[in-house]
Amino acid sequence: MGIHGLAKLIADVAPSAIRENDIKSYFGRKVAIDASMSIYQFLIAVRQGGDVLQNEEGETTSLMGMFYRTIRMENGIKPVYVFDGKPPQLKSGELAKRSERRAEAEKQLQQAQEAGMEEEVEKFTKRLVKVTKQHNDECKHLLSLMGIPYLDAPSEAEASCAALAKAGKVYAAATEDMDCLTFGSPVLMRHLTASEAKKLPIQEFHLSRVLQELGLNQEQFVDLCILLGSDYCESIRGIGAKRAVDLIQKHKSIEEIVRRLDPSKYPVPENWLHKEAQQLFLEPEVVDPESVELKWSEPNEEELVKFMCGEKQFSEERIRSGVKRLSKSRQGSTQGRLDDFFKVTGSLSSAKRKEPEPKGPAKKKAKTGGAGKFRRGK
């Protein structure tokens, strides 16, 4: 879910924080991508007029989505995929709710199938989609053959994407989860891995502008996000987005808001874990950006054909064609961006951003199969 209603709220009260760009605008940019979110998008992709996300046996697969969306970034984008680690304990309540919703969707799917309601069948089938360890492992193997770096986050992928962006290792974090801003990513990109059929422009959300327009610091913004509703604790019933903004701007903290609220009108949840949620957002368990070395290498064409065609039964012609496009883009992206060498003034994206040094668990290193070093494609 991320943060409930945050994208709409920013569009309403801080529209200058949002930019829309064509993918060609990102030539030479390094971007940290939430891998699990991308895989989920590939698994629920609607295949209109073609079966590009299915193999010759008709099996839906995330591999072709990962292959083609990564190649789609042939305008010189340098992606690094970040995979989820162990979910934080605070998320257990949200995960339990998702299991309940999945069980209910299974019942509704069966009823829709018996009634022959095709649209309802598709809707409830999507609700049952879940990214598995096998999906992750196969996509990691594919990325290594493509020469694309990836890493395993110790916990939430979007938090580690944000850490990489804060440290300047990448230009932005790419995910659909708005809590990437709550974790402190200076720039959040949405729709980067969305289906081409949707024709969605890439949206950029700039945290510094959000804070400036709202008149908040990062700690107050975190409190606002908790009031809106997150994956990690309940929100206060009866407080909508506009009211939440007004309250945090006036009282500056959740603690002061709670002290002044009428409990009969706005009852605070019992055993409310807002302090734990604050700490999780401000000091998340993330990769240590300084230990991460990002390298992109040439794709291994023959091993890709062996894996994608021999094992997974995809068209060899499509795979070899894709490899050629990937190699061509790799050569182009090595030229670099002009603003990597010259400071560009008056540009939102080129503004220097000073972020606080990560503390405590934020310094934890990436989990990379026990090797202790960042794994990269060969």
UniProtKB/Swiss-Prot annotation:
Chain segments carrying region Interaction with PCNA: 334-342
Originating gene: Fen1
Keyword field contains Cell inner membrane: no
Residues noted as binding Mg(2+) 1 in the record, renumbered to the chain: D34, D84, E156, E158
GO biological process: base-excision repair; DNA repair; DNA replication; DNA replication, removal of RNA primer
Post-translational modification: Acetylated by EP300. Acetylation inhibits both endonuclease and exonuclease activity. Acetylation also reduces DNA-binding activity but does not affect interaction with PCNA or EP300. Phosphorylation upon DNA damage induces relocalization to the nuclear plasma. Phosphorylation at Ser-185 by CDK2 occurs during late S-phase and results in dissociation from PCNA.
Oligomer status and interactors: Interacts with PCNA. Three molecules of FEN1 bind to one PCNA trimer with each molecule binding to one PCNA monomer. PCNA stimulates the nuclease activity without altering cleavage specificity. The C-terminal domain binds EP300; can bind simultaneously to both PCNA and EP300. Interacts with DDX11; this interaction is direct and increases flap endonuclease activity of FEN1. Interacts with WDR4; regulating its endonuclease activity. Interacts with POLB.
Species classification: Eukaryota, Metazoa, Chordata, Craniata, Vertebrata
HAMAP family cross-referenced by the UniProt entry: Fen (MF_00614)
The enzyme's E.C. designation: 3.1.-.-
GO molecular function ontology, one term from the record: magnesium ion binding
Protein name: Flap endonuclease 1
Function, as annotated: Structure-specific nuclease with 5'-flap endonuclease and 5'-3' exonuclease activities involved in DNA replication and repair. During DNA replication, cleaves the 5'-overhanging flap structure that is generated by displacement synthesis when DNA polymerase encounters the 5'-end of a downstream Okazaki fragment. It enters the flap from the 5'-end and then tracks to cleave the flap base, leaving a nick for ligation. Also involved in the long patch base excision repair (LP-BER) pathway, by cleaving within the apurinic/apyrimidinic (AP) site-terminated flap.
Entry-linked SMART domains: HhH2 (SM00279), XPGI (SM00484), XPGN (SM00485)
Annotated localization: Nucleus, Nucleolus; Nucleus, Nucleoplasm; Mitochondrion
Chain segments carrying region N-domain: 1-102
Region (I-domain), start-end ranges: 120-251
Top EC category: hydrolase
Cofactor: Mg(2+)
PTM-bearing positions, type N6-acetyllysine: K78, K352, K373, K378
